[in-house]
Swiss-Prot record:
One of the protein's GO biological processes: mismatch repair
Protein name as catalogued: DNA mismatch repair protein MutS
GO cellular component, one term: cytosol
Residues engaged in binding ATP: 609-616
ATP-binding among keywords: yes
Lineage of source species: Bacteria, Bacillati, Bacillota, Bacilli, Lactobacillales
Annotated InterPro entries: DNA_mismatch_repair_MutS, DNA_mismatch_repair_MutS-lik_N, DNA_mismatch_repair_MutS/MSH, DNA_mismatch_repair_MutS_C, DNA_mismatch_repair_MutS_clamp, DNA_mismatch_repair_MutS_core, DNA_mismatch_repair_MutS_N, DNA_mismatch_repair_MutS_sf
UniProt similarity note: Belongs to the DNA mismatch repair MutS family.
Keywords (A to Z) from UniProt: ATP-binding, DNA damage, DNA repair, DNA-binding, Nucleotide-binding
Function statement: This protein is involved in the repair of mismatches in DNA. It is possible that it carries out the mismatch recognition step. This protein has a weak ATPase activity.
């Protein structure tokens, strides 16, 4: 694209663009941000802007597109939400007084991980930016939410854990050290880049005093380095005060119940796996928080349940108190509805972007605190203690109240922000303006009297200032020596007099000084807020916690949840357990509850029964009860006695990863291997229909081997559902395995009815054909399948028909399980067939991706033809 090197402005633009080649450069030009060249072409498409050109008639016109500066934030958000970066270039001096080219510089680089939110939107999502640092045999992760100030770090020995942590946090952008990009880019980019996560690089540098202060509590060297990289990136890109970022804290992942992204997805924890929305997920059910801070904290608790029983019990005590005291809970929640996003308001104050309306939002939030405190202090000891921790910050609320008007404008540069009586100078300027307005009104009366023109009026125009307007029919009645023509209209003339000019100067001067003074005082108040950021953040943490706990109590009350108890024994004792999300979408009383009892002698339940009968629901409900209990929530059951679990592993549903070239069976085996390698006796393992992705006897053999490995080596509490009824005999030889099944009955007409109840012993048959009939398969097909099934059960033959022949394979009643049944006649009849068979022999089927398989099939088809 052509460049106009001899234009000073374009030279300046290219110098800036060279520093930010991967970002859209928003170049401030008067009242607009301009995009040039490729930025303009691409930006016009994404943002639906009009594409024009600079120097249209030249040999190389420069594409450009403009955005009004007051509307820029909306366009920036669109680009950043799609994974782009935006460099904001501002004029660093007043163009009216600048000598030569106006100085410009990048004041902020907005990226997916540094995007800010306001304090009023009620956004319950964190926006995390992370840094990942490979060290000797470990990986360290540091992450920050710039919009709240949260800064944390952790270390793990496995790259898979890094990916799980980033996935759990829903990180939008990952920063790598420039020194590590070459060595780690392939490993990270292949798994992050394809998932829409932006990868950025940051050079290493000696930590500043601020960075050293923020990392002083960290003890692990690699965590300090990762956090330093992260903070240096933020300071380089944001170029503003970041006093709201709290000192980094380190946490051990072992202190939390661990589960990976597949488990989060399989259990619909934070979003429904099918719709990808919050509705239909566990979070959607239990989130009754009234503040944005509470909503974010609830999600954090859900994704990081605890393993320390004393911490869990402390949460449960508060939930219990709120559940027992409906009036206190209701009053608290009413007050919480008046609280804005304190964390993000504090962040905006620190960064200097807080406007007057947000100051009022802060004041209104603080005004709700005394009411919250009063309600809690009148409750039981547990809640009263929580209330005593609240700082109502009446000093700050009073300052904002006395200084800032209740309904300020959005702009902080146009005045009308400061209350009357707060500042003598502003009051003086306002009096001057008021006096002059009265003078203008009197001028109009006097001019009408002197001229006899009753239609004469005094007005104001932004371009021409104050004027006297007279219709053309009355022009002759004016004394020409006093009136100076200012503007000619179609039906009127506008004039100015020396006296009017003099008063206009007084008005303009008073307005400018008033506006300047109001902004000065507004900044003073905002700086006062900034000095109290740590108090606001501490208050926000307390409010968020109260919001979450009262929300959980509300759910417990409305959903009939009970308080779980924890035991040091290796037992699960759940009476009338329920799947909370499934129950919530059914009519009252329709959900069939089930007991889950695994005492110290039983580690595994082998679950059989027909498809659609509820095996997966039974398994999921146990996992959800465990997660709810360890996050500090009541649970959907009549009784729930549980051990403290360290990890949950699930394989539920067929989650093929076609994009990663992995088949159902490969995913099954990878997830099973993760459990077999990582699970302990304190883990919970849920395997649903493992082995279905391969040949029947291969799958059965693997399923049996996995069951026996779990039983012999791991001893984890396990629910293992299977359609291989032959495996039920394992319970005869393994005393820690018990058979259960999901009940179903046939009526007199042969129709199948699911009971959805877990019953002792193995299922007598799978009812697969009944399920196929329920799915609506043709009756002819169902009848044929029934006939074939009877033949198989009698040890007869399977018959497959083609256009040319009928080939039979006889199943002997005493055939060993390991013998595969040949369904097709594979006799070689010619060279072409032999070539095809040779090609098949050479294919590495187990390591083929779906795309490889399709290409291979196409080659075989060509060989045949």
């Amino acid at each position: 694209m052509g460049k106009i090197a001899d234009t000073p402005m374009m030279v300046q633009y290219h110098e800036i663009k060279a520093q930010y080649p991967d970002a859209f450069v928003f170049y401030r030009l008067g009242d607009f941000y301009e995009l040039f060249e490729e930025d303009a072409i691409q930006g016009a498409k994404i943002l639906e802007l009009t594409l024009t050109a600079r120097n249209k008639n030249s040999e190389n016109p420069v594409p450009m597109a403009g955005i009004p500066h007051h509307a820029a934030q909306n366009y920036i958000d669109i680009l950043v939400d799609q994974g782009y970066k935006v460099a904001i270039v501002e004029q660093m001096e007043d163009p009216a007084v600048a000598k030569g080219m106006v100085k410009r510089d990048v004041v902020q680089l907005v990226t997916p991980g540094t995007k800010m939110a306001d304090g009023a939107g009620g956004d319950k999502q964190n926006n995390y930016l992370a840094a990942v640092l490979p060290a000797k045999n470990v990986w360290s992760i540091a992450y920050v939410d710039l919009s709240t100030g949260e800064l944390r770090a952790t270390t793990t020995g496995r790259f898979e854990d890094v990916m799980d942590e980033l996935s759990s946090l829903e990180v939008k952008e990952v920063v790598l050290s420039k020194n590590d990009v070459a060595t780690t880019e392939q490993q990270i980019a292949s798994q992050l880049g394809e998932r829409g996560i932006v990868i950025s690089a940051q050079g290493t540098a000696e930590p500043s005093a601020t960075v050293s202060f923020l990392t002083q509590a960290l003890k692990v060297t690699s965590e300090i380095e990762a956090t330093t990289i992260l903070l240096n990136y933020i300071f380089d890109t944001q170029r503003r005060s970041l006093d709201h970022i709290v000192p980094a804290t380190s946490y051990e992942r072992l202190k939390f119940l661990k589960f990976n992204q597949d488990t989060r997805s399989n259990l619909d924890l934070v979003e429904n796996m099918r719709t990808k929305k919050k509705a239909g997920s566990l979070l959607g059910l239990i989130d009754r928080t009234n503040t944005a801070m509470g909503g974010r904290l609830l999600k954090q608790w859900l994704l990081k349940p605890l393993r320390e029983s004393s911490d869990i019990e402390a949460r449960l005590d508060l939930v219990q108190s709120f559940q027992n005291d409906f009036l206190t809970r209701g009053a608290l929640q009413d007050h919480l509805k008046s609280v804005y996003d304190l964390e993000r308001l504090a962040a905006r104050a620190a960064m200097g972007t807080m406007n007057a309306r947000e100051l009022v939002q802060l004041k209104r939030s603080l005004r709700a605190i005394p009411g919250i405190k009063s309600v809690l202090l009148q409750a039981d000891t547990t809640l009263s203690n929580a209330g005593q921790q609240l700082d109502d910050m009446t000093d700050l609320a009073d300052l904002i109240d006395v200084a800032i008007v209740d309904e300020p404008p959005v702009s902080v540069r146009e005045g009308n922000i400061i209350n009357d009586g707060f500042d003598e100078r502003i009051d003086g300027y306002r009096q001057v303006l008021k006096d002059n307005q009265q003078w203008l009104a009197q001028l109009e009366i006097d001019e009408r009297a002197q001229t006899g023109i009753n239609s004469l009026k005094v007005g104001y125009n932004k371009n021409f200032g104050y004027y006297i307007e007279v219709t053309k029919a009355n022009i002759g009645r004016l004394a020409t020596d006093r009136y100076q023509r200012l503007q000619t209209l179609t039906n009127a003339e506008r004039f100015v007099t020396p006296a009017l000019k003099q008063h206009e100067s007084l008005i303009i001067e008073a307005q400018a000084k008033r506006t300047e003074r109001e902004y000065e005082l507004f900044v003073t108040v905002r700086e006062h807020v900034k000095s109290d950021i740590s108090r606001i953040q501490t208050l926000a943490q307390h409010i968020a916690r109260l919001d979450v706990l009262s929300s959980l109590a509300d759910v417990a009350d409305n959903q009939r949840f009970v308080r779980p108890t924890f035991t040091n024994q290796h037992v699960i004792h759940i009476m009338q357990g329920r799947h909370p999300v499934v129950e919530s979408i059914l009519d009252a009383g329709d959900f069939v509850a089930n007991d889950v009892i695994l005492d110290e002698s039983i580690n595994m339940q082998l679950i059989t029964g027909p498809n659609m009968a509820g095996k997966s629901t039974y398994m999921r409900e146990l996992a959800l009860i465990v997660i709810l209990a360890q996050m500090g929530s009541f649970v959907p059951a009549d009784v729930a006695e549980l051990p403290i679990f360290d990890q949950i592993f699930t394989r539920i549903g067929a989650n093929d990863d076609m994009a990663m070239g992995q088949s159902t069976f490969m995913v099954e085996m990878a997830e099973a291997n993760d459990a077999l390698q990582q699970a302990t006796a304190n883990s919970l393992v849920l395997f649903d229909e493992l082995g279905r992705g391969t040949a029947t006897y291969d799958g059965m053999a693997l399923a049996q081997a996995i069951i026996e490995f779990l039983d012999k080596h791991i001893h984890a509490k396990t629910l293992f559902s299977t359609h291989y009824h032959e495996l039920t005999v394992l319970a005869d030889n393994h005393t820690s395995i018990e058979n259960v099944h999901v009940g179903a009955v046939e009526d007199d007409e042969g129709q199948l009815h699911f009971l959805h109840q877990i019953q002792s012993g193995p299922a007598d048959k799978s009812y697969g054909i009944h399920v196929a009939a329920l799915a609506g398969l043709p009756k002819e097909l169902i009848d044929n399948a029934t006939s074939i099934l009877h033949d198989l059960e009698a040890g007869k033959m399977i018959v497959t028909q083609t256009n040319d022949q009928v080939a039979s394979a006889v199943i002997q009643p005493d055939a060993h399980l390991s013998e595969q049944v040949a369904l097709f006649d594979m006799t070689v009849t010619d060279d072409k067939t032999q070539k095809i068979l040779d090609a098949l022999d050479n294919y590495d089927i187990l390591n083929m991706t779906p795309v490889d398989a399709i290409n291979a099939l196409n080659r075989l088809k060509k060989m045949r033809s």
